[in-house]
Amino acid sequence: MRLFRSREVVGIAADALDFALEASAETHPNEYMGLLRGEEARRVGVDRDGYVVTDVLIIPGTVSDPYSATVRNDLVPNDFHAVGSIHSHPNGVLRPSDADLDTFGSGRVHIIIGSPYGPDDWEAFDQSGEVRDLDVLDADLSDPESFFDFTQDDIDAELDR
């Protein structure tokens, strides 16, 4: 079973992008890094085929400085909704470095956010490091507190997908 799904990522929820921009600004002057989680577009009220980035997962044990951020792979969850990665460049450069490209092999979309972390200070890339379109979408996201409200039936249904 693959960690990253092969279906196309059609956009990012505005709330998820806002969270990442704020987190990047708060982490400055160090790099910020997270993983992107997606849901089927229609499940979040978007009338399109494919996935929408709905969440940014912060991985415990991530170490960062002004030039890099490193995620501990042993702490990355086996999340079947993972669609890519996101990180900041405190120097504002919105191009992937060689080290970035080495991490782009898994996932369909990778986002780099640059200082000063405004609404247009980011770029999306494909696995090869080529710029790609990624629409900012108004998605119907669930209340984050509801994440912890589930039953065994919910778990079984998720595993059967």
UniProtKB/Swiss-Prot annotation:
Gene3D superfamilies: Cytidine Deaminase, domain 2. Zn(2+) binds at residues 87, 89, 100. Residues 10-131 form the MPN domain. PROSITE patterns: MPN. It comes from the Archaea. A motif (JAMM motif) lies at residues 87-100. GO terms for biological process: proteolysis. GO terms for molecular function: metal ion binding; metallopeptidase activity. Binds 1 zinc ion per subunit. Keywords: Hydrolase, Metal-binding, Metalloprotease, Protease, Zinc. The active site is at 31 (proton donor/acceptor). Its cofactor is Zn(2+). The record marks 97 as: Transition state stabilizer. InterPro entries: JAB_dom_prok, MPN. Pfam families: Prok-JAB (PF14464). Belongs to the peptidase M67B family. Probable metalloprotease. Does not hydrolyze SAMP1- and SAMP2-protein conjugates, diglycine-AMC, Ub-AMC, hemoglobin, cytochrome c, carbonic anhydrase, creatinine phosphokinase, beta-amylase and bovine serum albumin. Monomer and homodimer. This is Probable metalloprotease HVO_1016.
